[in-house]
């Protein structure tokens, strides 16, 4: 996963994705921490990529 921190990211370029790191605990609500914007984003168990800052795909 390639994430690039750009300070406090609010928007990403149209062709980029918001990269989040999942620090959620089992049996609890997931907590996603915004890592930055990336043009190449791959999801894993602990990483999530979204097209918006609200993580609404």
Curated annotation (Swiss-Prot):
It is found in: Secreted. GO terms for cellular component: extracellular region. It holds the Pfam family Toxin_cobra-type. Disulfide bonds join 3-19, 12-37, 41-49, 50-55. Expressed by the venom gland. GO terms for molecular function: ion channel regulator activity; toxin activity. It comes from the Eukaryota. Keywords: Disulfide bond, Ion channel impairing toxin, Pharmaceutical, Proton-gated sodium channel impairing toxin, Secreted, Toxin. Belongs to the three-finger toxin family. Short-chain subfamily. Mambalgin sub-subfamily. This three-finger toxin inhibits ASIC channels. It acts as a gating modifier toxin by decreasing the apparent proton sensitivity of activation and by slightly increasing the apparent proton sensitivity for inactivation. It binds more tightly to the closed state and to a much lesser extent the inactivated/desensitized state of ASIC1a. It interacts directly with the outside surface of the thumb domain of chicken ASIC1a (ASIC1a), but does not insert into the acidic pocket as suggested previously. This is Mambalgin-3. The lineage of its organism: Eukaryota, Metazoa, Chordata, Craniata, Vertebrata.
């Amino acid at each position: 996963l390639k994430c690039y921190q750009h300070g406090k990211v609010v928007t990403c370029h149209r062709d980029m994705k918001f990269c989040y790191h999942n620090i959620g605990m089992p049996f609890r609500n997931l907590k996603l921490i915004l890592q930055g914007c990336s043009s190449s984003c791959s999801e894993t168990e602990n990483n999530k990529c979204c097209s918006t800052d609200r993580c609404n795909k």
